[in-house]
Structures are given as structure tokens and as C-alpha cells.
Amino acid sequence: MKHFLRMLIQVCLFFYCKFLWRCLKFVMRKLTGRCELQRICYNTKPGASRTMKIETSLRDSKSKLLQTSVSVHPDAIEKTIDDIMELKKINPDINPQLGISLQACLLQIVGYRNLIADVEKLRRESYDSDNPQHEEMLLKLWKFLKPNTPLESRISKQWCEIGFQGDDPKTDFRGMGLLGLYNLQYFAERDAAAAQQVLSDSLHPKCSKFSKAEWEKKRMDKAIGYSFAIVGINITDLAYNLLVSGALKTHFYNIAPEAPTLSHFQQTFCYLMHEFHKFWIEEDPMDIMEFNRVREKFRKRIIKQLQNPDMALCPHFAASEGLINM
């Protein structure tokens, strides 16, 4: 009975707050002469703060047009903006900037949804050793990470040198599908020097950029490495979940002035690999069995950073040269 009453009170409070919010929006429109979309665009700076407010306003609207606008095809965005302006009785000649601002926001919102679909498609595609394209990507990964060491054969214990678990890497891609391979190859190709350094450090953590004095100060005398490729696939899983949960909206809405793309996602992966590598060394785990603890602590730190509406996980290395800050 108590549970039922608690649920009833929560439902009543929800509808009461919703009613009050609609009343407040009505009063604000009468006082300012502007609808909620206008107030957001005129009073909030471009980036995640504005786009996320616009997204919430559209999604929670009573209008079917506004509700569905967040999932239209990119080619239909311009017409959708015209329809919204007409619905809200806003003259585009008097308010030319509003249409431009709304279009920028919708490009980001729709682009984020499409990015999830693109990433999900790669995640669901299994690695196929009979597919020449898949095999070529895998062999390129080796060449980028070990340019001076030829791979003796496709099935080889050498794969363990770059962090795979066995002599055939295809079994390690089961969890993240081709997405894991795409990310690893992107990191190794676009930021070869950094990727090779991270690989070297993962094998020999004491040979990293920390000086001997810093090692002693941080008491990292027992520092251990990790499996580069396996951790890369695991960080791919982290990036994927941040994307699907919406946590990465803050980042993408701040760095992509239009629709975020797969390249933006891969650049984010590169950033996470850099940051996790530093975090792992700083945490100085006793053994590899502490990986899940360190990863969870790292995940919480990233999520906390992304709760800041001004946050952008902008890496300062070669792979990030294509990023555009707003």
C-alpha cells in the first residue's frame, strides 16, 4: 500500500510540475514576446548549452512537428526549420539569425543520432577472416604499430606483442566487432608516433616519459603494463557506451559546429586512449587484475568532466588536427 501511495504521489508531482512548466512558458512568452526556442537561441551561447536546451525543448513539446524534428533526415532539416518558424509565427526576415541558430542545433542533434547508428553498425559487424578488407585492416594495424618488424605469418604468436590474447586476433574482436579494429587502426595510422609510444609504455611502463625521480616520488616501483590491443577494444566499449548514453553530447556539441561524424568518434577514442594510459600509470595498480577497478574509476572521471556543459575532450596531438572548436 505504501509503495502504491508513493508511486501515486510521484505521478501527481510529475504532472503538476509539467503543468506549472507549461504555465511558466506561457507567461514568459507573453512577457517577452518570444517563444522558448527564441529565448534559448538569444540567451544561450552556441555549443552544448544551447543545443541540449533546444533538444529538450523540441522533444518535450506538445507539437508533433517539434517532437519529430530531432529525428528527420539531414536533407529535410532546412524545410523543418521553415515549418517550425511558420508554426511559431516567426517572421524569418525579422529574425534571420534564429533560423541559422536552429539549423545548427538540428544538424548536431540529428547528426548525433546518425552517428550512433553508424557506430552501432560497425559494432555489430563481426570480423571475417575471409573478407580481404578486414584482413587488410588487421595487417595494416601491425605495420603501423611495428613498422620495423615484419609479421612472419597471419596466424602467429607475434600478435601478442601488440596486446592480443592469442595467435589469431579475430577472436578478440567478438565483443566490439569491427568497431574495435577501426578505432585501433585509426589511432595507429593517424597518430603513429603516439600510438607506438603508448604501445612501448604498455609493455615497459618504467620506460615511459616519467623520470627516475618522478617514479620514486610516485612510488611506482612495481608498475606493470597492460595488453595494448585488448585495452584498446575495452576503451572502444567505453567510448561506445558514452556515445549511446548521451554523455558525449556535451563534447560533440562543443567541437562539431555541424553534424558529428565517425572521425569525431575515433578522435575521441584516441583521446581516451591517451588519458587512460596516463591514468593507468598514475594509479600504479599492483597487477592486471585491478584493470576493472582502474577502468571504472577512469570512466567516472570522464563522465564527471562531461557533465560540464563547456567541456570538450580535445586531444592535443596529430589525430585531432581536424577538430573544430566552436
From Swiss-Prot:
Membrane-spanning residues: none
ELMO domain: residues covered: 133-306
UniProt cross-references to Pfam families, sorted A to Z: ELMO_CED12
Alphabetic keyword roster: GTPase activation
GO molecular function: GTPase activator activity
Statement: the UniProt record of this protein carries the keyword Nucleus: no
InterPro entries listed in its UniProt record: ELMO_dom (IPR006816), ELMO_domain-containing (IPR050868)
Alphabetized PROSITE patterns for the sequence: ELMO (PS51335)
Function, as annotated: Acts as a GTPase-activating protein (GAP) toward guanine nucleotide exchange factors like ARL2, ARL3, ARF1 and ARF6, but not for GTPases outside the Arf family.
PANTHER family per UniProt: ELMO DOMAIN-CONTAINING PROTEIN 1, ENGULFMENT AND CELL MOTILITY
Protein name in the entry: ELMO domain-containing protein 1
Organism: Bos taurus
Originating gene: ELMOD1
